[in-house]
Amino acid sequence: MVRFLRPSSTSRDVLGLVHGTAGQATLIQQYDNMLKNFLHMPMAHPVIIICDNDDGIVSLSKKVRSKFDKIVSKTTTDSFYHLCLNLYMVKVPEGDPPAATDIESLFDPELLTKVLDGKTFNPKKDHEDQTEYGKVVFAKAVIKANAETVDFSGFEDLLTRVEDVIRHYAKHSAVPSSSTVTP
């Protein structure tokens, strides 16, 4: 089962998850240090950061390279990037040939042209104005509101990458239980 973190004031304040890529970069930079404060960390599941493969990947790439010595860019095509502990990063698939892609590009292009109250969708907008709406409004008013009829088949490759992370974490985090340990 996959669960998504619901944005809240707690996730914003504690995890610093605001403003998309900037918040993701902060989480990547501070994740292992934040966990040092906890005595009990069962870490039964991986934590997966899904990021657009567009210009925003540059700031994430710098953090990943400086902290974990891993190379991530618009053109790298790894299924996922294991950063530390149970923290992973998955990019929106790059396409063939590799190119800048954001998660919205996985939807049917017709959905991206949906006009709401006379406003058009602009994936680069953080907020609404008189002529355009951004990703949050798109997610709520276009995708969530029409979830039963939206074609999600374009997400197949991304979901395969998430499955790859789950399999990798299950394989590499397994701790023998007392019933499987032999004396």
Regions from the language model: what does each represent?
Residues 2, 28, 32, 65, ...:
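Generic detector of well-ordered alpha-helical segments enriched in charged/polar residues
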Residues 44-150, 181-183:
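Activity-critical C-terminal alpha-helical subdomain
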Residues 19, 31, 40, 45, ...:
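Histidine (H) residue identity feature
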Residues 15, 19-22, 117, 133, ...:
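Feature targets compositionally biased, intrinsically disordered low-complexity regions
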Residues 35-38, 64-76, 162-173:
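Hydrophobic, Leu/Ile/Phe/Ala-enriched alpha-helical segments that form helix-helix packing faces
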Residues 137-183:
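Nucleic-acid enzyme cleavage-core boundary/entry regions
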Residues 9, 42, 111, 120, ...:
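Generic secondary-structure transition motif, activating predominantly at the C-termini of alpha-helices
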Residues 1-65:
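Conserved helicase/translocase motor-coupling segment
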